[in-house]
Curated annotation (Swiss-Prot):
Any one of the GO CC terms: transport vesicle
Family (UniProt): Belongs to the ATPase alpha/beta chains family.
Gene designation per UniProt: ATP6V1A
InterPro entries: ATPase_a/bsu_AS (IPR020003), ATPase_F1/V1/A1_a/bsu_nucl-bd (IPR000194), P-loop_NTPase (IPR027417), V-ATPase_asu (IPR022878)
A Pfam entry, by short name: ATP-synt_ab
Known catalytic reactions: ATP + H2O + 4 H(+)(in) = ADP + phosphate + 5 H(+)(out)
Subunit structure: V-ATPase is a heteromultimeric enzyme made up of two complexes: the ATP-hydrolytic V1 complex and the proton translocation V0 complex. The V1 complex consists of three catalytic AB heterodimers that form a heterohexamer, three peripheral stalks each consisting of EG heterodimers, one central rotor including subunits D and F, and the regulatory subunits C and H. The proton translocation complex V0 consists of the proton transport subunit a, a ring of proteolipid subunits c9c'', rotary subunit d, subunits e and f, and the accessory subunits ATP6AP1/Ac45 and ATP6AP2/PRR.
Main function: Catalytic subunit of the V1 complex of vacuolar(H+)-ATPase (V-ATPase), a multisubunit enzyme composed of a peripheral complex (V1) that hydrolyzes ATP and a membrane integral complex (V0) that translocates protons. V-ATPase is responsible for acidifying and maintaining the pH of intracellular compartments and in some cell types, is targeted to the plasma membrane, where it is responsible for acidifying the extracellular environment.
GO molecular function: ATP binding; proton-transporting ATPase activity, rotational mechanism
Native organism: Mesocricetus auratus (Golden hamster)
Activity regulation info: ATP hydrolysis occurs at the interface between the nucleotide-binding domains of subunits A and B. ATP hydrolysis triggers a conformational change in the subunits D and F, which induces a shift of subunit d. The c-ring is subsequently rotated and results in a continuous proton translocation across the membrane.
Protein name per the record: V-type proton ATPase catalytic subunit A
Amino acid sequence: VGHSELVGEIIRGVNVSALSRHKIMLPPRFSMVQVWPVRLPANHPLLTGQRRTALVANTSNMPVAAREASIYTGITLSEYFRWAEALREISGRLAEMPADSGYPAYLGARKHFPSVNWLISYSKALDEYYDKHFTEFVPLRTVGMLSNMISFYDMARIKADYAQLLEDMQNAFR
C-alpha cells in the first residue's frame, strides 16, 4: 500500500480453499485509466475531514446514466446529512434528545404524531357502508374506542394486543 506496482507483479493472493490459491497480477501493457486513491500506511494520520466525508465515486468510462445516478445519489446523501444536522441543532436549542424517527420522544406520550395527517384520515370513511350492511358495528367501534380496551374481557384484550403486535411487526413505517 502506498507504492506503485510493476508489470507482472503479484498484487494480492486470495485463498479459495485449502488446496487452491488465486494470484492477482498486473498484466503486461495494462493501462490504468483511473488513478485509484490508496490510503497511506498507518504512520500517516488521517485528516479530520475524512472522518466526516461520504464519498460517491464512479469512473469516467461509465455510461452517462450511471454518472448521473451517482450525482443524484450524492445530492440525496447531502440533503439527508443537512436534515440530520438541522434536527440536531433544533434538539440542542430545545435541550432535548431526538427520537428514532426524528420527532421528540415526548410527542407520543401526548398522543401527538406529526407524521399522521389528521385532515386526510380515512378511518371513518366506511361509516355509511357499515351503517347499511352491519348496523351494530359503528356503535360497537365507538364504545371500543371510548373504553380504550379497559372494559374488554381477557380473551378479547389478548386478541387485540396480539393484533397490535402483528401490526407493529408488519408495518415498517411506524
